[in-house]
Amino acid sequence: MKKSGLLVIVMACAAAGLYSQTFTYIGSAKCAICHKTETQGRQYPIWQGTKHSQSFAALSSPQAAEYAKQANVQNPTENPDCLKCHAPLCEKSAELKAEGVSCEVCHGPGSDYKKLNVMKDVALAKQNGLIVYDSQDAIKKQCLTCHANAHGKSFDFAASFEKIKHNKPAQ
């Protein structure tokens, strides 16, 4: 009886570990290793060519200074209201802060899905933290967390999506 009770406790602890797994952010440079070629969909170079990759740097621009002045913000590069959209992972590390709106902002922390054998199996990658959107509406909902009337500007999802969309890698 004692052995079976111990086995139940060990199994319960192991199962709890599976469901309380925490993933860590690794930075977009790790994503670039695989996601830069035409074969893989060029996700990284596409991201580099968008305002997302420059969103934190934009907080140091004259335009940001004007927005900050209007909003009574001293330093937009340190203001939580600015950072929540311009550098959503800022509290994780200085590197992630500088990346602005990086791969992992939309696709989740890559520590456990970054390996090729995991990425080749979408279900396994999802189990390991990858966020994959199942529809354009789901993508739009994610975008609107920051782009809904940002700075008083309307958001044209269709036009904006054309600038950032990237192909899924070949399976």
Each PLM stretch: what is its role?
Residues 4-14:
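Sec-dependent N-terminal signal peptides
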Residues 141:
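Cys/His-rich zinc-coordinating modules
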Residues 18-98, 104, 110-137, 157-171:
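Sequence context of c-type cytochrome heme-c attachment sites
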Residues 145-159:
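Short, exposed beta-strand-loop hairpins at the edges of beta-sheets
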